[in-house]
């Protein structure tokens, strides 16, 4: 009977140790994921800055993510080039205005 209790105690100890190692690995993976998200957030393109080379890299605004808005520019040489900047689309501006107005009225 004593041998069975020793074996059971040993198994419980091994299982708890291995599960705690797994939890530590999960916590480390979550930490790395959060650090990667923070790095991505730091690398986003601010509002009103050029996004021609990275059209999906605009930062978030107050409520919505800024969109890369492009226009065709004609240079003095007559060449047409596309220039893009991160901005807030008109329908997002209207929604932000309504929400801001609602916050002022209803506190």
Curated annotation (Swiss-Prot):
Disulfide linkage: 44-59, 51-68, 58-86, 70-84
GO cellular component, one term: extracellular region
Signal peptide, first to last residue: 1-20
Family: Belongs to the neurotoxin 19 (CSTX) family. 04 (U1-Lctx) subfamily.
Chain positions listed as propeptide in the UniProt record: 21-41
Domain notes: The presence of a 'disulfide through disulfide knot' structurally defines this protein as a knottin.
Protein name per Swiss-Prot or TrEMBL: U1-lycotoxin-Ls1m
Family annotation (InterPro entries): Spider_toxin_CSTX_knottin (IPR019553)
Secreted as UniProt keyword: yes
Species name: Lycosa singoriensis
Subcellular location: Secreted
GO molecular function, one term: toxin activity
Tissue: Expressed by the venom gland.
